[in-house]
């Protein structure tokens, strides 16, 4: 793992940087600690899909995240099949409905609706249904959210074993789920799930969710709604001028909880550009607002990428094309005091992007869409630096260390634009040939 940076971004070797990296980040350093309820961390992200075993199997293979728990016919659940993948504190849940007429009372997820799940899959393909937060008290989080204008999705329920569960609407058909449970519980996930042991499981080094990004038609009302009922504060903002290309752009804001360990960025499309915004493309193919991408943190993203790329051609995930070699000359000037020459060369070989703010360094890479539609994708990420100590003297990393890749947005946008252009060219050729 690369060492922690010892010099600020604006001094030393990092002072001479490429123009893209030279532009200042609009990072909001003031933390008002304004949460409406005590939010501890991400708990899980749930996908609704047509077949849980198939979807979970592909993600497990691609990410090196083994099956950790299940709830299905084998556990007495005839309403839905759910499979949980886990790596570190990272938890991906995949849920699919069984046939019509099954006993809804056997569901381990109390808010599950087979009819709604079928509509969801038909409307969105494989997509995120629930962004779940671990909170101190799910019932209180629900009540506090409702008092501040949150639209209810599922009222609080006691699951037993000290677990509580509730949901409010987030954006589109996505819900924000509240889960509370005692520390040190021996329940493998939620009551009703059975643990799965796999002594031969692989480990690619994935540790946790870093952030979960939503695409919406209009940023201001969506951000005001979510910030209003959660109390989450603005952590960063970007505009089309900051992060677009000459052909398209977006506006974005990042919301964060008190600890800044839960980060919820939101994007909106910019209209009137040469090309249709990539955010608008998402909204059209997804069928409305939804989760655009999930950033997954790694303790060593270069190792993680070597493992993942080895499986790309065998059913794993594909990655966006790497930037041109000249990009990495800028990386040497930007982060050569933190990354060794061997590490920079490996970043170039693997297509990893590098950025830096005044507190830390960011390594990131993006997959191509993981389903049939050009919508949901993943980001693999490593943050370097920003280490602090809590009141117990234990070291931890500040949330959002190294920023959100503002210096790489133009590179990312160009890569996605090229990918979309290739799809459009093939569609045009197919139409002309018909």
Swiss-Prot record:
Gene Ontology biological process terms, A to Z: L-phenylalanine catabolic process; tyrosine catabolic process
SUPFAM superfamilies documented for this protein: Glyoxalase/Bleomycin resistance protein/Dihydroxybiphenyl dioxygenase
Region feature Disordered, mapped onto this chain: 1-21
Bound cofactor: record note: Binds 1 Fe cation per subunit.
Names of the cofactor(s): Fe cation
Subcellular location: Cytoplasm
EC number: 1.13.11.27
Pathway: Amino-acid degradation; L-phenylalanine degradation; acetoacetate and fumarate from L-phenylalanine: step 3/6; Cofactor biosynthesis; prenylquinone biosynthesis
Reaction catalysis annotation: 3-(4-hydroxyphenyl)pyruvate + O2 = homogentisate + CO2
Sequence ranges assigned to domain VOC in this UniProt record: 41-192, 208-368
Bias (Low complexity) ranges: 7-19
Keyword presence, GTP-binding: no
Major subcellular site: cytoplasm
GO CC term, one of those recorded: cytoplasm
CDD domains in the record: HPPD_C_like (cd07250), HPPD_N_like (cd08342)
Family: Belongs to the 4HPPD family.
Protein name: 4-hydroxyphenylpyruvate dioxygenase
Source organism (scientific name): Hordeum vulgare
Lineage, highest ranks first: Eukaryota, Viridiplantae, Streptophyta, Embryophyta, Tracheophyta
């Amino acid at each position: 793992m690369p060492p922690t940076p010892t010099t600020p971004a604006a001094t030393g070797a990092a002072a001479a940087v490429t123009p893209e990296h030279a532009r200042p980040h609009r990072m909001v350093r003031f933390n008002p600690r304004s949460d409406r309820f005590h939010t501890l961390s991400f708990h899980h992200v749930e996908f609704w899909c047509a077949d849980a075993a198939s979807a979970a199997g592909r993600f497990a293979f691609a990410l090196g995240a083994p099956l950790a728990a299940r709830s299905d016919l084998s556990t007495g659940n005839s309403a839905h099949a759910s499979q949980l993948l886990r790596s570190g504190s990272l938890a991906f849940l995949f849920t699919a409905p069984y046939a019509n007429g099954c006993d809804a009372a056997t569901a381990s997820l109390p808010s599950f609706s087979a009819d709604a799940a079928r509509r969801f899959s038909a409307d969105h393909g494989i997509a995120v249904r629930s962004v779940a937060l671990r909170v101190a008290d799910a019932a209180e989080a629900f009540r506090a959210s409702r008092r501040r204008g949150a639209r209810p999705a599922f009222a609080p329920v006691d699951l037993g074993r000290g677990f509580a569960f509730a949901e409010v609407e987030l954006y589109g058909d996505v819900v924000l789920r509240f889960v509370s449970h005692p520390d040190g519980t021996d329940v493998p996930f939620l009551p009703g799930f059975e643990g799965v042991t796999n002594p031969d499981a692989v480990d690619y080094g994935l540790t946790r969710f870093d952030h979960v990004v939503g695409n919406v038609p209009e940023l201001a009302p969506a951000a005001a709604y979510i910030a209003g009922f959660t109390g989450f504060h603005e952590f960063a903002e970007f505009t089309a001028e900051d992060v677009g290309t000459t052909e398209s752009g977006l506006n974005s804001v990042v919301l964060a909880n008190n600890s800044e360990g839960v980060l919820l960025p939101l994007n909106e499309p910019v209209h009137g550009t040469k090309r249709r915004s990539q955010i608008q493309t998402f909204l059209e193919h997804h069928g409305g607002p939804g989760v655009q991408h999930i950033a997954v943190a790694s303790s060593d993203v270069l190792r993680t990428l070597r493992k993942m790329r080895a499986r790309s051609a065998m059913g794993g995930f594909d990655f966006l094309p790497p930037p041109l070699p000249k990009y990495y000359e800028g990386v040497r000037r930007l982060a050569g005091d933190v990354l060794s020459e061997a590490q920079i060369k490996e970043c170039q070989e693997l297509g990893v992007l590098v950025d830096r703010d005044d507190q830390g360094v960011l390594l990131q890479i993006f997959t191509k869409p993981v389903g049939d539609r050009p919508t949901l994708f993943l980001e693999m990420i490593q943050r370097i630096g920003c280490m602090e100590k809590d009141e117990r003297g234990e070291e931890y990393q500040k949330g959002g260390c190294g920023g959100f890749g503002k210096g790489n947005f133009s590179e990312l946008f160009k890569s996605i634009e090229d990918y979309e252009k290739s799809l459009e060219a093939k569609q045009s050729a197919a139409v002309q040939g018909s």
